[in-house]
Amino acid sequence: MEIQTAESNVICSIDIFESLSDSVDVAKKLVEKSQESNEAESTTDLRSIEAGFEGVVKQMGETLQSIPESTFDEEEYIGVVIQSLSNEMQNATIGDGSKSEMINNGQQKISAKHTPDIVSEQMEEDLYPTDPEFSYESYMMYSESQSQMTDIPDIPSKSTDVSRQRKHGNHSESQSLVTEIPDIPSQSTNVSSQRKHGNLSKSQSQSTEIPDIPSQSSNASSQRKYGNLSESLSMLPQVTQFMEPPYQAFICPLTKEIMEDPVTTETGVTCERQAVIEWFDSFGNSDEINCPVTGQKLTTELSANVVLKTIIQEWKVRNEAARIKVAHAALSLGGSESMVIDALRDLQMTCEGKEYNKVQVREAGIIQLLDRYLTYRSKDVRFELLKFLRTLADEETDDGKEMIVKTITMSCVIKLLGSSHQPVRHAAQALLLELSKSQHACEKIGTARGAILMLVTAKYNRELDSFASETSDQILRNLEKCPENIKQMAESGLLEPLLGHLAEGSEETQVAMAAYLVEIDIGHEKKTYVAEKACPALIGLVQSENIDARRAAFKALAHISLYHPNNKILVEVGIIKIMVEEMFTKRVFSDLMNSRNEAATILANILESGLEHETFEVNTHGHTLGSDYFVYNIIHMLKNSSPDDLNIDLIRILLSLSKSPRAMATIVSVIKETDASFAMIELINNPHDELGVGALKLLIALTPYIGHTLSERLCKTRGQPENLIQCPVEANQITEKHAVSAKLLAKLPHQNLTLNLALVNESIVSEILHAIHLIQRSGARTSRYATDFLEGLVGILVRFTTTLYEPQMMYLARNHDLTSVFVDLLMKTSSDEVQRLSATGLENLSSTTMTLSRPPQPRSTKFMGSLSMPRSFSLRSSKKKQIEICAIHRGVCSAKNTFCLVEANAITKLLACLQSDKVEVVESALAAICTLLDDKVEVEKSLSMLSEMNAVQLILNAVKEHKKESLLQKAFWMIDKFIIRGGDKYASEISQDRMLSGMLVSAFHRGDGNTRQMAENILRRLDKMPSFSTYIT
């Protein structure tokens, strides 16, 4: 039997769907036909199309009505909707095609919707008449004829069989109760058996003396709250009849509102207690008090009408439960905007101040229906929804709040904080304020994307919206219950909660806040403020015995110290002594958390900030950061194989101290005393790149003081120094270690023959030249360290030119044509240091040219003449080859073999360097040119060549531009050469430069010994000073 029923249901459903599908197809054809019509088409065709549409709609309505009742057992309210839609479709009419008539029909429908007759105010007549035309005597006669009505009327049953009504077609009002809506548990209790059996004689006898009170004078809000539904909700089919109208006996004759605490006077009139008391107070004399209804004299004695109060309360409970059902149906349907608004308002009035009704709303599943209305197109709907949600959340327990945050999409609520409609914006903030009182809700709000950022923004925009600012501030204070929210506030720019909990919270909270300080990115403008507020608390945690607290505090302090302006604050709170004690004093739990590493990091950050550290005391004995005590302990730790991370910070500390001459002298002294240079050189080979780079930088800083010692020990280290030259395949692969390694080799003393010989290797020099070519060719496609690497490589080549007396160095310079390499580098680089080094290399090479240049030797012919060979096989050419002699060096010269600057075309490039802004480049170029004016060469020829290249003016311009003593000495020496060896021509040109005369006078007055002597000589030769041939006594 069950199988047959299931099969029939399936067949029935298929028939229904097929029928609906056929109707839709017919409707589509009618639409196509209507679209094809034009203005010339006859009215008859239009009416036929309309009639076709009307038939299709009615057919679909009949099909919907045939859906079995069993389909909606679990969700009966859907059946109500389907039946309502079916009735409307069956009664649907379509106009006759006339545009004006259709408009009139539409206007009539709209006006019909707003007709007040549709929503009739109803009141039960069992206790008191509700019609003002119905007199009290008539009512008594009616009561006697209806003896069964003397008791309190029965509440309409909820068990009416609606399915039976549908089946038999009986749709009268008396039978159209809303049974399809799921029942909501009621708080009301059944009326006692005494009340059922007529034991209300006393209250009834008192009530019969009260004259008729017109129901239309009742307060409208009271009627709305406890009685009638709104117009839009009353339009719901088969729903409104479930509402129980208010009884006339419930209305207070004074306030015209439903009574909350009814009391009966001695005249038998029942009124609201507070209203009666106010009525009594309005009389000055108690003897003049009259009944407000009967006019009889009264005393102030009142008796509580407990039975009526109970009846009113139970009536309210029943109607409130019914209102919840009606609102559930309205929100489920998602009808018109007005219907949704009225449903939300009814729910709010029903739940306001009544915890039980809020529970009923939650259990009825209404909250689940509300989420979609957060994105409703109407701002009024969103406003009412937010108000209602706030009402649900406003309760003593957190159940309502938790259900809201679990069900409602919090991101939608957060978006409404930015609404352009101020009421919506304020309602959203009020809801969040109420929700934020719950711990669970605080977590959910914090996880909503952008929630805290928008609240922080609103808090700071007090000028734009003071209410939003104050409310957001309260919400944020509530959200502080969740530590993760505090972190988000700090990330959004609100740091006070984090700093406040760090300063005053429990130790566990302080640890969490300290960890957040490391994780968040604080703007530069607030880092100093954070340091001022956080450092005292962090110092306290550092001195705690809790390992987790100490670890978090050390990391936070290290993070704070990275911002250099903060370090002054750290020094003021006494961090130096605490960190030094952590580094030099053994503690039981120091090794457990590597506090030495953290302390060294903080000290290194402080020293790198550039503070004057020489006066910072490290202990109570007066030792400072630059003292032997501190430096010795640092180097001792570095020498004794400390962990790599600690060694990195120790090297950073020494590098910072090396910037002070006094501290540098101490470091050099301790290194020599402890022989720690070997340990530092060994660190170069460490696989940790950062440690290796740090060690190389420290060795570079020590080079001017113990360079030869470092060179000797570097050569004794396994794999060194050749391993320091590692040339990458591509220019963009150059690392910092490549650059500092080459720089160390370039900075070590150039005259150290041991190191130079260790570097003389055909493959090494070839790699250097290849790397230089690679960098020049790559242009902008290079690493950030490419320039430093290039400077180091050129410096290594220059060091080879300082020991050319060694045959291997001479062979290397000739074989690789270093002269041409340096000449090319003068112009093909943007680095001033490379230019300076290239000019220095040319100077070193050119200083040997005179020695290497030899006059051409006559070829011996004795041996060749003794050979008798045919004339055609003679080795002598028919024309002797002319050998050119260098006019300056008086011999055979070449750029490759004798390093002649003239043959290498280097003079013009060196003179161009005189126009550089860098004094070091100009000085090196002058030094290279000076080799052409040495007494061993043909000075006159050199002067003539330089004069043709405008060298005199370039030298004078360099003197005017730069004031360095060593540069002035070289420039004055060259000018003196031009005056002495060049004759009056050059002397006249030089003497006409007035600025030069002033500079010579200034150098004569304030220059050092050599510069002053040279200036004096030039002034004498220019007749600016008297020349004494004999001593005058």
UniProtKB/Swiss-Prot annotation:
Region (Disordered): 145-226
Listed CDD domains: RING-Ubox_PUB
GO term, biological process aspect, one: protein ubiquitination
Gene3D superfamilies with a match to the protein in the record: Leucine-rich Repeat Variant (1.25.10.10), Zinc/RING finger domain, C3HC4 (zinc finger) (3.30.40.10)
Claim: Methyltransferase is one of the keywords in the record: no
Limits of the U-box domain: 245-322
Annotated metabolic or biological route of this protein: Protein modification; protein ubiquitination
Keywords of the record: Repeat, Transferase, Ubl conjugation pathway
Keyword Cytoplasm: no
Superkingdom as given in the UniProt entry: Eukaryota
Membrane-spanning ranges: none
EC number assigned by the record: 2.3.2.27
InterPro entries hit by this protein: ARM-like, ARM-type_fold, Armadillo, RING-Ubox_PUB, U-box_domain_protein, Ubox_domain, Znf_RING/FYVE/PHD
One MF annotation (Gene Ontology) recorded for this entry: ubiquitin-protein transferase activity
ARM repeats: 483-522, 523-562, 564-608, 610-659, 665-704
Ranges of compositional bias, category Polar residues: 200-226
Reaction it catalyzes: S-ubiquitinyl-[E2 ubiquitin-conjugating enzyme]-L-cysteine + [acceptor protein]-L-lysine = [E2 ubiquitin-conjugating enzyme]-L-cysteine + N(6)-ubiquitinyl-[acceptor protein]-L-lysine
Purpose of the protein: Functions as an E3 ubiquitin ligase.
Name of protein: Putative U-box domain-containing protein 42
